[in-house]
Amino acid sequence: PTTRPAPTIRPVPGERAFMHTPVMVREILALLAIRPDGTYVDGTVGGGGHARAILERLGPRGFLLALDRDTNAIAMAREALAAWSAQCCFEQGNFADLKPLAERHGLQAVDGVLLDLGMSSLQVDQAERGFSFMQDGPLDMRMDLKQATTAAHLVASLGEEALAEII
């Protein structure tokens, strides 16, 4: 496969860094029923909006494992949630690998898992990521920028039937 370098997303000088405004935060927190000493996983941390809401409700013995496939999202969330660094660990990875990622942090059980599925505005707003429907950009569409295969490679190398199955 053609390997493209991973784009690095940085705020434009003078602009605020990306901050995720979570949707349905009250409903999500009610469903998670956050306990101050609980252990939680945000499997799609993105910009950290939902994670912040969880961390604000945790006590000193509470813990959050924050995961994301997107290395840029992990870096931004780590910065946005630095005040909770004693209670929050970050891992670049796929939530499908939750068990080994959790075990790496000594977690055998958790009290709740949040998965906010889909693209984030972090990806859509950056034309170079290839997800934008408002700006021209390369046909990339990788959630995990460490992956070599881009959407352009798939379109060029797969047949119509295989592409239809993906879509």
Which residue stretches match the model-derived regions?
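S-adenosyl-L-methionine-dependent methyltransferase catalytic core, i.e., the SAM/SAH-binding region
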Residues: 1-4, 9-167
